[in-house]
């Protein structure tokens, strides 16, 4: 039985240099190879003209360059494109391309499904299947860049920003997420600034500490509630790592990071009469007063069977004004791609429609109190 070939997309530069050394080659060949793969989108060794023919043959015998395929895509009226990426065994993850002015952001998945079961998130209701490999994470970027068009003569790439905000909790897949982000940041990889790579987490605190010791990228934190009582319902991982513990981890990360310029982005989904009262805005401001941050208010994007509604513009505006009175920078996120279910919280692969009856049942089970202001 022939030995399984190494997928070079699974190796960061350190891993590639080790491979070349083991093959009896100079480590700098790894740099050349990465440039072909990530700058020019080349997957055929024969096209790598500055690598000698003997080495190209050795690579072809032992290695492959294989990214997961695009199974389908949908394009929104606003230019957003949602890709279904086939990761094998009948499984798909979703990747979203968001163009805006002079930037083009790719929202990348880290897991098939998600184990955290956030009650406002469609992916969280799908359940967890498995972690994605390094090649399946960076392969999303590589494949979408190929779809959009690498400019092979210049090495220009069509993606300027990557956010680890797709399906899954990145901190539950650190083994593969860290080398994948290394490739994103590497000058011979996707060559993105550390301020242009953002990881979003719901608060797996021990893994956040490991992340801070391993790599420096921008951090977004999913808060979504101003107190533990409500967050236990909306973000169940809070029962294990409550807000005080999460905020401590965030401050430790900020202290180590240059990418965040001294503050993180707080993500707060706006759920109608659930977490959007002016009293809760005051509570959130007091909660975050010792954690340098800007606040990103995210209008809720409904999905079939969701027990929640989107906050009205007037409630979002009042909430925002309270936070600004405390000196916070507040951004209300534009909803992009909601006509193709590509907006925040809507990514769920094969998740099926839930009925209104199920939504009502979930609301009753969680005993969520509704604010009346």
Swiss-Prot record:
Keywords: 4Fe-4S, Cytoplasm, Disulfide bond, Iron, Iron-sulfur, Metal-binding, Methyltransferase, rRNA processing, S-adenosyl-L-methionine, Transferase, tRNA processing. It is found in: Cytoplasm. Disulfide bonds join 107-344. GO terms for cellular component: cytoplasm. S-adenosyl-L-methionine binds at residues 168-169, 200, 222-224, 301. Binds 1 [4Fe-4S] cluster. The cluster is coordinated with 3 cysteines and an exchangeable S-adenosyl-L-methionine. GO terms for molecular function: 4 iron, 4 sulfur cluster binding; metal ion binding; rRNA (adenine(2503)-C2-)-methyltransferase activity; rRNA binding; tRNA (adenine(37)-C2)-methyltransferase activity; tRNA binding. Specifically methylates position 2 of adenine 2503 in 23S rRNA and position 2 of adenine 37 in tRNAs. m2A2503 modification seems to play a crucial role in the proofreading step occurring at the peptidyl transferase center and thus would serve to optimize ribosomal fidelity. Belongs to the radical SAM superfamily. RlmN family. Reaction proceeds by a ping-pong mechanism involving intermediate methylation of a conserved cysteine residue. This is Dual-specificity RNA methyltransferase RlmN. It comes from Shewanella denitrificans (strain OS217 / ATCC BAA-1090 / DSM 15013).
């Amino acid at each position: 039985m022939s030995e399984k070939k190494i997928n070079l997309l699974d190796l960061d530069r350190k891993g590639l240099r080790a491979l070349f050394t083991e093959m009896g080659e100079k480590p700098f060949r790894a740099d050349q190879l990465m440039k072909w793969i990530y700058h020019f989108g080349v997957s055929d060794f024969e096209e790598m003209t500055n690598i000698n023919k003997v080495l190209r043959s050795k690579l072809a015998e032992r290695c492959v360059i294989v990214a997961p395929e695009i199974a389908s895509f949908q394009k929104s009226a606003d230019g957003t494109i949602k890709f279904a990426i086939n990761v094998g065994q009948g499984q798909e993850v979703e990747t979203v391309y968001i163009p805006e002015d002079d930037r083009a952001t790719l929202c990348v998945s880290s897991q098939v499904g998600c184990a955290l079961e956030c009650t406002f998130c469609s992916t969280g209701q799908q359940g967890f299947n498995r972690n994605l490999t390094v090649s399946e994470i960076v392969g999303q970027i590589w494949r979408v860049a190929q779809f959009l068009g690498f400019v092979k003569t210049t090495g220009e790439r069509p993606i300027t920003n990557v956010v680890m905000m797709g399906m899954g909790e990145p901190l539950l897949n650190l083994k593969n997420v860290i080398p994948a982000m290394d490739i994103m940041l590497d000058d011979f990889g996707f060559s993105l600034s550390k301020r242009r790579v953002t990881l979003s987490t719901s608060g797996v605190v021990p893994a956040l500490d490991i992340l801070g010791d391993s790599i420096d990228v921008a951090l977004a934190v999913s808060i979504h509630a101003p107190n533990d009582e409500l967050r236990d319902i909306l973000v169940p991982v809070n029962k294990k790592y409550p807000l005080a513990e999460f905020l401590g981890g965030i401050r430790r990360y900020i202290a180590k990071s240059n990418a965040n310029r001294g503050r993180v982005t707080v993500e707060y989904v706006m759920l109608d009469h659930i977490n959007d009262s002016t009293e809760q805005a005051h509570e959130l401001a007091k909660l975050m007063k010792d954690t340098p941050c800007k606040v990103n208010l995210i209008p809720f994007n409904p999905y079939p069977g969701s027990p929640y509604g989107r906050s009205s513009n007037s409630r979002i505006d009042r909430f925002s004004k309270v936070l600004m009175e405390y000196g916070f920078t507040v951004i209300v996120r534009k909803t992009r791609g909601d006509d193709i279910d590509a907006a925040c919280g809507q990514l769920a692969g094969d998740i099926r429609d839930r009925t209104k009856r199920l939504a009502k049942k979930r609301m009753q089970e969680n005993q969520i109190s509704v604010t009346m202001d």
